[in-house]
Amino acid sequence: KGYIALLGWSLNAVEAAESFDRRYVVVAPDWAEEYCQQHDIPYVPWNFERLNDRSMEIAETLKEMGVDVAIPLFEETVEWAGAINSVLLDNPRLLGQAMLMRDKSLMKRRAQLGGIRVGIFEEAHDRDDIIRFLKRVNQTLLKLDGDPNDPIHVKAFDKAGCLGHRVIRTPDEVDSIPDEESPSLMESHL
C-alpha cells in the first residue's frame, strides 16, 4: 500500500485512511496542527491559499518523506495535488491535467450558480471509459432502443483550442480516437 498525502483537512478522510490501513500524512493549514498533535495524526503545515516562491518546497518535502501520491480533498487543493504529483511521479503533464479539471469544474460551478445549464463531465483514460460515459449519459436521458444517441464531446487534455475535440454519437466512433489523445475530458452535449 502506498504512502499518501491528504491535501486539506477532513477528519472523515483521516479516518478513511486509517480504516484502510494506509500510511498517510495530513498537509493542512496551521490551525489543524494542535488537533493533529493531540490525536497523533501525522501532519505537515502548509498554507494552500496562494502559490509562492516556496511552492516547490512542499513537493520536495513530501518526496523526501517517501510519499507516493498526493490526494486533494477539496477543489482548492486540486491544482496543488497536480503540481506535487508531477514531482512525486516525475510526470510534468499531471499539473496541466489537474489545472484543466479544476478550471473546468470552477467554470461550470460558476455558470450553474448563475442559472446557466451545464453538462456533466468526466475524465477518460481509455476508449472503454468513453463508451461507458456515452451509454450512461444516454440511459440518463431515458433513450429507448432505436432512438438516436445524444452526442458527447471528447477533448484530449494535451491539445489546445479545438484540436483533439470530437463529437461522439455511437460506440463505433470511439475506435477512431487515437491512443495519444488519452487521457481526455468527456462532456455531455447541451
Model region roles, listed by residue range:
Residues 1-32, 36-41, 60, 64-69, ...:
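Preference for protein termini
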Residues 6-12, 76, 124-128, 190:
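Short beta->alpha connector loops
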Residues 9-10, 29, 74, 104, ...:
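Helix N-cap/beta->alpha junction signal
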Residues 12, 32, 76-77, 173:
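Alpha-helix capping/helix-boundary segments
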Residues 15-16, 36, 80-83, 163-165:
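Short glycine-/acidic-enriched loop or helix-start segments at secondary-structure transitions
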Residues 39-125, 129-132, 136:
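Conserved N-proximal alpha/beta basic substrate-recognition cap immediately N-terminal to
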Residues 102-105, 159-163:
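Conserved A3 ("GATE") glycine/threonine-rich loop of ANL adenylate-forming enzymes
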Residues 117-119, 140-154, 163-190:
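Conserved ATP-binding module of the ATP-grasp superfamily
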